[in-house]
Amino acid sequence: MNTTLRRDADEIIHASIQAVLPDKAVCRALENFQPRDGRVLLVAAGKAAWQMAHAAVQALGRVDGGVVVTKYGHVKGEIPGISCYEAGHPVPDANSFAATEKALALVQGLTEEDTVLFLLSGGGSALFEQPLVPGGELQDITNQLLASGADIVEMNTIRKRLSAVKGGRFAQACAPAKVFSIVLSDILGDPLDMIASGPAVPDGSTCAQALAIAEKYQLRLSAQAKALLAQETPKALDNVTTQITGSVRELCAAAAEACRKLGYAPLLLTDRLCCEAREAGSFLGAIARTHAGQEKKLAFIAGGETVVHLTGKGLGGRNQELALAAAPALAGQNAAVFSVGSDGTDGPTDAAGGYVDGDTAAALAAKGWNVFDTLKNNDAYHALQAAEGLIITGATGTNVNDVAVALITG
C-alpha cells in the first residue's frame, strides 16, 4: 500500500464529511423558523436524524415533544423531550413501522396554532414508513428494487404509493398544523419530492410512471399493491414550508479544498455521478493511469450515487465496488482511487467505502484474489479487507450522497 496516498485519502475524507455535518446547517435553517403560538413538535427521520434533532433542540431551547427514527447505531444519546428509535435500512423493518406509528400518533389532533418541525435526511424512505400493504410484502418489493439496479428516483416513485407517510401524506396527517421542513439532500439535483420519498412535499411523479417502473423491472406485486400504484398521491399542500440545506455539491467542494491544501490540483468531473459502480471505478482508474507520470499532483473528483446490480452472493457496497473496479487500471502507478459514503455506511457492511492504489492489484493476486471474479460475486468487502483497503469511519450523522476521488502523484 502507498501509505502517503492513503494518508492523503483519509485527510480528504475527514475534511469532506466535516463540511457537511448537519449541526451548523440546521442552525442556519432555523434562522427562518417562525413557529406559531401553540405547541412545537419535532419529527426527524433519516440517517442524519439524531444529529439534526440534537442541533435543533439545542438551538431552540425546548420542544413540546418529538420522535426521531434513524439507522441502527446512529443514536448517540438522549435528547431532552424526544423519543429516539433505531430501525432498518435499506429495507424497512418492524422498528421502522413502530417508530413511524409513534410519529403519526404525535401529530394527530393538532390545531392551526401548532407547528411541526420536520427534519429529513437520506435513508428516510426505509426508516420512516407506515405501509399500506403488509409489511412483509413491502420488504420484498424493496429487496426486488434494490436487486434490480433501479435508481433512487425509480425506487421512491414506487415506494410513495405503498406508504401512508410518503409522497406528501405525512404533511396531510399533520394538518391543519404548520410544517416547517429542513432537508438534507441525498439525491442528485435535490428533487424535494424524492428525498426520503417526500413525506412533506407534493408528489411530482405520476401513477403512470410508477406502473411503467413496475413493468420495466418486472416487479412481483400483489393485486393490492398494483391497485395502489394506480392511485395518485397528493399534488398540492398548503401547510408546508421547506428549506433545503446540505448537498453533494458542498461535499465535492470540501473535497476539492482538502485536495488543494494537500498540494493537488483538483478538478470536479461531476456532482451528478449516476451509473454502475464498477463502470465509474474503471473510468476513474483509467483517468488516473492516463495522467500518471506528470510532475503536477492531480485530483479528479466525482460526487453522486452509483448503483450495483447484484449477481453474486458476496458482501460489499457501491463505494467498495467502485474502488475495487479501479484497481486493475492503477497497477504499478503512483495513484489511488477511493470512494466513500458521506453517512459512513456502504451497503450492509461496517465500511463507509474503499481505497485502492497502484499496489492493490498485486497484493490481492498474491493472496489468491482475482479482481474481476470478485466483482462478479459482488464481494468487494472481503477483497478490500484482504488488501487493507476498507474505509471505516463509523456513522457520521450526515447523508449527502457519495464522493469518489482519483489522486495522482506523478
Residue map of PLM features:
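Active-site segments that bind and position negatively charged phosphate/pyrophosphate groups
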Residues: 263-339, 347-348
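A glycine- and small-aliphatic-rich helix-loop capping segment at beta-alpha/alpha-beta transitions
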Residues: 55-65, 79-84, 104-108, 131-144, ...
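Short beta-strand segments
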Residues: 43-45, 67-70, 117-122, 181-187, ...
